[in-house]
Protein backbone atom coordinates (compact mmCIF):
# COMPACT_ATOMS: atom_id res chain seq x y z
CA UNK A 1 0.00 0.00 0.00
CA UNK A 2 2.82 2.39 0.89
CA UNK A 3 4.56 1.70 -2.45
CA UNK A 4 1.33 2.51 -4.27
CA UNK A 5 1.01 5.80 -2.38
CA UNK A 6 4.60 6.74 -3.23
CA UNK A 7 3.98 5.91 -6.90
CA UNK A 8 0.83 8.05 -6.99
CA UNK A 9 2.62 11.01 -5.39
CA UNK A 10 5.54 10.67 -7.82
CA UNK A 11 3.20 10.59 -10.81
CA UNK A 12 1.35 13.66 -9.53
CA UNK A 13 4.62 15.57 -9.22
CA UNK A 14 5.71 14.54 -12.71
CA UNK A 15 2.34 15.51 -14.16
CA UNK A 16 2.86 19.07 -12.95
CA UNK A 17 5.97 19.70 -15.02
CA UNK A 18 6.24 20.32 -18.74
CA UNK A 19 7.28 17.45 -20.95
CA UNK A 20 10.96 17.28 -21.79
CA UNK A 21 10.44 16.92 -25.51
CA UNK A 22 7.90 19.72 -25.82
CA UNK A 23 10.41 22.53 -26.02
CA UNK A 24 8.81 24.11 -22.97
CA UNK A 25 10.35 24.77 -19.62
CA UNK A 26 7.24 25.99 -17.84
CA UNK A 27 4.79 24.14 -15.67
CA UNK A 28 1.24 23.28 -16.58
CA UNK A 29 -2.00 24.20 -14.86
CA UNK A 30 -5.04 22.07 -14.23
CA UNK A 31 -7.95 24.22 -15.37
CA UNK A 32 -11.30 23.95 -17.08
CA UNK A 33 -12.18 25.41 -20.46
CA UNK A 34 -15.94 25.49 -20.96
CA UNK A 35 -16.19 22.90 -18.18
CA UNK A 36 -13.72 20.46 -19.78
CA UNK A 37 -10.39 19.69 -18.07
CA UNK A 38 -7.34 21.23 -19.78
CA UNK A 39 -3.65 21.44 -18.90
CA UNK A 40 -2.06 24.36 -20.72
CA UNK A 41 1.59 25.26 -20.31
CA UNK A 42 2.00 28.40 -18.22
CA UNK A 43 3.77 31.64 -19.05
CA UNK A 44 3.94 33.36 -15.64
CA UNK A 45 7.09 35.49 -15.99
CA UNK A 46 7.78 38.39 -18.34
CA UNK A 47 10.60 36.37 -19.93
CA UNK A 48 8.37 33.35 -20.52
CA UNK A 49 5.53 35.54 -21.84
CA UNK A 50 7.96 37.27 -24.24
CA UNK A 51 9.21 33.91 -25.56
CA UNK A 52 5.81 32.23 -25.71
CA UNK A 53 5.68 29.62 -28.46
CA UNK A 54 8.48 31.14 -30.55
CA UNK A 55 10.63 28.71 -32.53
CA UNK A 56 8.46 25.72 -31.63
CA UNK A 57 7.14 23.40 -34.32
CA UNK A 58 4.44 21.87 -32.12
CA UNK A 59 1.80 23.56 -30.00
CA UNK A 60 0.97 21.82 -26.70
CA UNK A 61 -2.37 19.97 -26.90
CA UNK A 62 -4.04 22.44 -24.52
CA UNK A 63 -1.96 25.41 -25.61
CA UNK A 64 -0.06 27.96 -23.57
CA UNK A 65 -1.71 30.25 -21.03
CA UNK A 66 -0.21 33.71 -20.53
CA UNK A 67 -1.02 35.03 -17.05
CA UNK A 68 -0.72 38.71 -16.12
CA UNK A 69 -0.62 40.02 -12.55
CA UNK A 70 -2.74 43.04 -13.52
CA UNK A 71 -5.30 43.49 -16.27
CA UNK A 72 -3.39 44.58 -19.33
CA UNK A 73 -3.94 45.88 -22.82
CA UNK A 74 -1.96 45.60 -26.00
CA UNK A 75 -1.47 42.72 -28.33
CA UNK A 76 0.60 39.73 -29.32
CA UNK A 77 2.73 39.26 -32.40
CA UNK A 78 3.98 36.21 -34.26
CA UNK A 79 7.64 37.06 -34.87
CA UNK A 80 9.74 33.86 -34.82
CA UNK A 81 6.57 31.78 -34.39
CA UNK A 82 6.59 28.87 -36.81
CA UNK A 83 2.96 27.73 -36.75
CA UNK A 84 -0.39 29.52 -37.02
CA UNK A 85 -2.27 29.93 -33.74
CA UNK A 86 -5.65 30.82 -32.31
CA UNK A 87 -5.51 33.20 -29.35
CA UNK A 88 -8.31 33.67 -26.84
CA UNK A 89 -8.20 36.59 -24.40
CA UNK A 90 -9.99 36.31 -21.01
CA UNK A 91 -10.73 38.81 -18.24
CA UNK A 92 -9.90 38.20 -14.56
CA UNK A 93 -13.14 36.24 -14.05
CA UNK A 94 -12.28 33.86 -16.91
CA UNK A 95 -14.85 35.29 -19.33
CA UNK A 96 -13.78 35.45 -22.97
CA UNK A 97 -12.90 38.96 -24.18
CA UNK A 98 -11.97 38.09 -27.78
CA UNK A 99 -10.82 35.23 -30.00
CA UNK A 100 -8.48 35.78 -32.96
CA UNK A 101 -6.55 33.80 -35.58
CA UNK A 102 -2.83 34.60 -35.86
CA UNK A 103 -0.42 33.72 -38.68
CA UNK A 104 3.39 33.48 -38.52
CA UNK A 105 5.27 36.66 -39.36
CA UNK A 106 7.71 36.12 -42.22
CA UNK A 107 9.13 39.67 -42.35
CA UNK A 108 8.92 42.98 -40.50
CA UNK A 109 6.73 44.72 -39.69
CA UNK A 110 4.76 41.98 -37.96
CA UNK A 111 1.02 42.30 -37.36
CA UNK A 112 -0.13 42.97 -33.79
CA UNK A 113 -3.13 40.95 -32.62
CA UNK A 114 -4.83 43.26 -30.13
CA UNK A 115 -8.19 42.37 -28.57
CA UNK A 116 -9.09 46.05 -28.16
CA UNK A 117 -10.01 45.51 -24.49
CA UNK A 118 -8.17 44.82 -21.25
CA UNK A 119 -7.52 41.19 -20.36
CA UNK A 120 -5.80 39.13 -17.64
CA UNK A 121 -5.19 35.85 -19.48
CA UNK A 122 -4.38 34.90 -23.07
CA UNK A 123 -4.58 31.29 -24.25
CA UNK A 124 -2.70 30.36 -27.42
CA UNK A 125 -4.05 27.22 -29.08
CA UNK A 126 -3.37 25.34 -32.30
CA UNK A 127 -4.84 27.19 -35.28
CA UNK A 128 -8.37 26.05 -35.97
CA UNK A 129 -8.94 24.62 -32.48
CA UNK A 130 -12.70 24.13 -32.43
CA UNK A 131 -13.29 24.47 -28.70
CA UNK A 132 -15.62 27.43 -28.09
CA UNK A 133 -13.33 28.77 -25.31
CA UNK A 134 -15.98 30.99 -23.74
CA UNK A 135 -15.09 30.41 -20.08
CA UNK A 136 -11.83 29.61 -18.30
CA UNK A 137 -11.82 28.50 -14.68
CA UNK A 138 -12.37 27.64 -11.95
CA UNK A 139 -12.08 31.11 -10.43
CA UNK A 140 -10.00 30.02 -7.36
CA UNK A 141 -7.43 28.43 -9.69
CA UNK A 142 -7.29 31.60 -11.81
CA UNK A 143 -6.76 33.75 -8.72
CA UNK A 144 -3.94 31.44 -7.63
CA UNK A 145 -2.25 31.82 -11.02
CA UNK A 146 -2.57 35.62 -10.87
CA UNK A 147 -0.78 35.60 -7.50
CA UNK A 148 2.03 33.52 -9.05
CA UNK A 149 2.50 35.80 -12.06
CA UNK A 150 5.50 38.14 -12.10
Language model features: what each stretch is:
Residues 6-15:
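Bacterial N-terminal signal peptides
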Amino acid sequence: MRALLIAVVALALLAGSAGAGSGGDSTVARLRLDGVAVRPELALTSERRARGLMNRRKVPADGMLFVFRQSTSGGFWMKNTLVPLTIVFFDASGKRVRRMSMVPCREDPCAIYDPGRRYRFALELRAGDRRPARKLGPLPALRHLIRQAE
